[in-house]
Swiss-Prot record:
SUPFAM superfamilies referenced in this protein's UniProt entry, alphabetically: P-loop containing nucleoside triphosphate hydrolases (SSF52540)
One MF term in the entry's GO annotations: uridine kinase activity
Domain of life, source organism: Bacteria
Provenance organism: Haemophilus influenzae (strain ATCC 51907 / DSM 11121 / KW20 / Rd)
Protein's UniProt name: Uridine kinase
Main subcellular location of this protein, as a coarse class: cytoplasm
UniProt keyword list: ATP-binding, Cytoplasm, Kinase, Nucleotide-binding, Transferase
Record localization: Cytoplasm
Residues given in the record as ATP binding sites: 13-20
Catalytic reactions of this protein: uridine + ATP = UMP + ADP + H(+); cytidine + ATP = CMP + ADP + H(+)
Amino acid sequence: MSNPSCIIIAITGASASGKSSIASTVHKELCNELGCQEIGIITEDSYYKDQSHLEMTERVKTNYDHPNSMDRDLLIQHLKNLKNGSAVDVPVYSYVEHTRTNETTHFTPKRIVILEGILLLTDERVRQLADISVFVDTPLDICFIRRLQRDMEERGRSLQSVIDQYRATVRPMFLQFIEPSKQYADIVIPRGGKNRIAINMLKAQILHLLNQK
């Protein structure tokens, strides 16, 4: 069944910039206003490439901040399917095994799909499919502190490993790919999830688009 009223919101920015917080806030508040059956979140992380054919020694070398780590074709196909009113089975990625699991998450068509990830606007096809593109513009030092706390507390990583990864891939890839993609955003949100005015503006624009469909 066609779903011409499906609106895709792409929310991007640096790792730990507050993307997930904004996506979660918008999702929760629109759930209350429209009903949770009308809105869903898909994370770009789910579309990292399957690496089950590689040995673990090769998998751990993955640069998760480079566009080549993503299965873009599958993501684009899923977005098109949702636009056309078809359900999709979103992959489940394991950072422990550095590859996809055998499980998927069944995602039914929604009026609003929030897509969240660091590399979204680096792909022209995603930009064309997104009805609203958002860049969360948070200073890199703040992002690093948040990432450091998160990875040590939630993922059991050492201080040195987080610092090494930040220097080797996170910061260089942000400067090379993510920051330049800000030019494609319709809305730039400073201060991340604490910017209440910007979140209200984003919600208002989403509701405006819904009324136009």
